[in-house]
Design a protein with these regions (language model features):
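Alpha-carbonic anhydrase
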Residues: 4-9, 13, 17-339
Length: 339
């Protein structure tokens, strides 16, 4: 087991040094360039899209077409272990002076460099968070408007990514679609099905032996983040502030500085729920595996007008859902079928 972990970390470092990777950008695996914004060379459609990532660099991007624990995946109730937010010791200080906001060509990214999280016996520092449109992970087969990826790194270069779904305000006077409120939508509506999907996840009985196998070192006493017990039901002030500057970085390679960012709101929202966790991969080239994923059951929301502003800059930037963990890579299987 130790040997396989060492190999994964070696490959992760080797691959990330050879390719542009949004997911790992700003970490020790792929340091941020001083004084400029590097524009990614891969894409999401045509000859540079996910089905062609292998051919952009066959040696570096081999895992994109052969890896068997690839991300994103469909987040289905009971498929992966659940971790209460109270076990993550999640702390992110406010960025009162604002921070850099960059257009990498394939996403827009907020530079962090501060914030702490602990998973099992490993401590992580928040490096950056970026966005995908639509969501890369699925919620029981359904995509969401967007997904935020918060990229964390440990002292020994292990990577963890916190995924947070982002909904668009429904325009009905407050609650965003998909979030739970005191006035629940009818059970047959899409909003209710999204809501009930997360409720099912949180209520599925745990197989503790299964949890221990997937999550060594998680358990015992952990610091509990004090937070309200309900998810945010209005557009996120944090996201509205960040995206308020998105028009300033409409061109790849540009950057600006955000206004003051209140991270406490985000911490409170995440701390109100749990995370479905699994070991997967970067969702961008080189698709390296050994990445710890923690996908929150709490959704954020933005205004419809904000969504359109972001969409005009990002466009489409989602990798297609991958097969079940441990199964043959879809691209590899298809290649063998047509030989």
């Amino acid at each position: 087991m130790a040997g396989s972990i060492t190999l994964r970390l070696f490959l992760l470092g080797a691959f990330a040094s050879q390719a542009m990777a949004s997911c790992a950008y700003g970490t020790l695996l792929h340091p941020r360039a001083e004084g400029k914004v590097e524009v990614n060379t891969f894409g999401y459609t045509g000859k540079t899209g996910p089905t062609s990532w292998l051919f952009l660099d066959p040696e570096a991007n081999a895992m994109c077409a052969t890896g068997t624990n690839q991300s994103p995946i469909d987040m289905v109730a009971g498929e992966n272990a659940m971790v209460p937010a109270s076990q993550l010791n999640l702390e992110i200080p406010d960025m009162t002076e604002g921070t850099e906001f960059e257009n990498l060509g394939t996403t827009v990214e907020v530079v962090a460099g501060q914030g702490s999280m602990r998973f099992g016996n490993t401590s992580y520092t928040l490096q950056q968070f970026h966005f995908h449109l639509p969501s890369e992970h699925l919620d029981a087969g359904k995509s969401m408007a967007m997904e935020m990826h918060m990229v964390w790194e440990s002292a020994d270069s292990q990577i963890a990514v916190v995924g947070v779904f982002i909904d668009v305000e429904d325009g009905a006077g407050g609650s965003p679609a998909g979030n739970s409120t005191s006035s629940q939508p009818p059970a047959s509506t899409p909003q209710a099905r999204k809501r009930d999907s997360f409720k099912m996840r949180r209520s599925v009985p745990h197989n503790h032996d299964h949890d221990k196998r997937q999550l060594p070192g998680v358990g015992g006493s952990f610091f509990h983040v004090n937070a309200p017990t309900t998810a945010a039901t209005t557009p996120s002030n944090l996201l509205e502030t960040v995206f308020g500057s998105v028009g300033e970085i409409s061109e790849p390679g540009t950057l600006t500085k955000t206004k003051s960012l209140n991270m406490a709101e985000l911490v409170s929202t995440l701390a109100a729920g749990s995370f479905q966790t699994y070991e997967g991969s970067l969702t961008t080239p080189p698709c390296s595996e050994g990445v710890r994923w923690l996908v929150s059951d709490q959704k954020l929301s933005i205004k419809t007008s904000t969504f359109h502003s972001v969409q005009s800059v990002i466009g489409f930037n989602s990798r297609f859902p991958q097969g079940a963990l441990g199964e043959p890579n879809t691209l590899d299987a298809l290649a063998k079928m047509v030989r």
